[in-house]
Amino acid sequence: MDAVKKPFIAAVSGIKNSGKTTFLEKLVKEITERNYKVAVIKHDGHEFQPDREGTDTYRMQHAGAYGTCIFSRGQWQMLKKEPGMDVERLAQFFPEADFILVEGMKNSLYPKFEMIRGSVSKESVCIPETILALVTDTEQKLPGIPVLGLDEIKKAADILEKLAETNKKTGEI
């Protein structure tokens, strides 16, 4: 019996304005160009406004619906007010993905690239054992952890590819 394929989950983490979104956008582009299917889950440490005022789904939410969903022939989007959501539960919506990349989650146990930009941060804020590489424009170093420049996207993708391949063989991260 074949093992069920499970997406490899990794994060891009760091403090606010450290360049997570820009790095992640480039990393997604690089990985998809390597013919992998990628999903992204963004963690927001604050409550966010998911819809625009005036849309039908916005109106239904404000009328009291605890959940709304919109779909067309090729895509769908759902909003459900539910406390306690986490990456593992959301990942179930992307079973066909090769990679699920999470933006944020600096205190999680997911393997991660930690962003450190000198203009906004000077030191690591993530659990050292979870860091795949520091991505930085500073001299910051941590023992045994590779350091990448802010634009070393191909090297970051190589790290992910290698780790995902190892994970496939061993079943572990």
Regions found by a protein language model. Give the residues of each.
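Phosphate-binding/switch loop-helix module in NTP-utilizing enzymes
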Residues: 79-107
